[in-house]
Amino acid sequence: MQIFHNLNEWIHFRNTLSPDLSLGFAPTMGNLHAGHASLFLASSKENHYTVSSLFVNPTQFNNPDDYKHYPRTVDADLELMTQNGVDFCILPNENEIYTDGYAYQVQENRLGQLMEGKHRPGHFNGVLTIVMKLFNLVKPTRAYFGEKDYQQLLLIQGMVKALFMDIEIKSCPTVREKSGLACSSRNNRLTPSQREIADEFAKIFHQNKSSAMISKELEALGITVEYIEEFQGRRFAAVKIGDIRLIDNYLL
């Protein structure tokens, strides 16, 4: 795997690649897990080359403590990428990415105001802006995103369509642990007792019951329920176990 620490080096290299070659792209913030690996493998099966990025994007954190405590595990992340078919990895720094000081932003004013957007003001502006920047840098044929962040996936699909971007957005199924808990970088921060509660969250959330009944059962376990909502035939949830925030969704 070839690693690029400098954006100018990447841009120069990208310009040398034949336009006849397909590029798959799976952007990440690091602290990788099996869910990320599934994106890399899906891309490597469908493209000549697979590109990823490691960048903890500050503009999508509405809580500064979350950004500060986000695990940085670069060596392990690069190893996982190498083992799962990534050919090129970009590791930009914040000054390179935000040369404008975040003066220019991508904003969506409908779906982006619901659920995650309602509870995390400004989050999706940061997500869409960094994804747009990375798309312009990588110029991928296809880009891969997990269904665990389904609202994010819908917004990226909408952005690409609205702005006439010639990129195919591929959705990949949520990867789950044996308990049914969705793989997430945040799972690593759970204590053993919190982990047991998180496993119960996954089981209860997937029950064939009303959102109100599910909320009541979760709250009885000491879980803080931010929202459980149904949207476009899916059920979405965001909860907090201690100070760890977890999200999930599934098709009804």
Curated annotation (Swiss-Prot):
Q: In which pathway does it act?
A: Cofactor biosynthesis; (R)-pantothenate biosynthesis; (R)-pantothenate from (R)-pantoate and beta-alanine: step 1/1
Per the UniProt entry, the Enzyme Commission number(s) are 6.3.2.1
MF GO annotations: ATP binding; pantoate-beta-alanine ligase activity
Q: Which residues form the active site?
A: H36
What start and end residues bound the annotated signal peptide? none
Which key words are in the record? ATP-binding, Cytoplasm, Ligase, Nucleotide-binding, Pantothenate biosynthesis
Q: Can you cite a GO biological process for this protein?
A: pantothenate biosynthetic process
Q: Which residues bind (R)-pantoate?
A: Q60, Q152
Please name the Pfam families in this protein's record: Pantoate_ligase (PF02569)
Keyword ATP-binding among UniProt keywords: yes
Please provide one cellular component term from the Gene Ontology annotations of this protein. cytosol
Which residues hold beta-alanine?
A: Q60
Top-level EC class:
ligase
* Binding of ATP, residues: 29-36, 146-149, 175, 183-186
Reactions accelerated catalytically: (R)-pantoate + beta-alanine + ATP = (R)-pantothenate + AMP + diphosphate + H(+)
Cellular localization per UniProt: Cytoplasm
Family from the record: Belongs to the pantothenate synthetase family.
On assembly, the entry states:
Homodimer.
Other known facts: The reaction proceeds by a bi uni uni bi ping pong mechanism.
* Job of this protein: Catalyzes the condensation of pantoate with beta-alanine in an ATP-dependent reaction via a pantoyl-adenylate intermediate.
- Show the HAMAP family listed in the entry: PanC (MF_00158)
What protein name applies here?
Pantothenate synthetase
Tell me the organism.
Legionella pneumophila subsp. pneumophila (strain Philadelphia 1 / ATCC 33152 / DSM 7513)
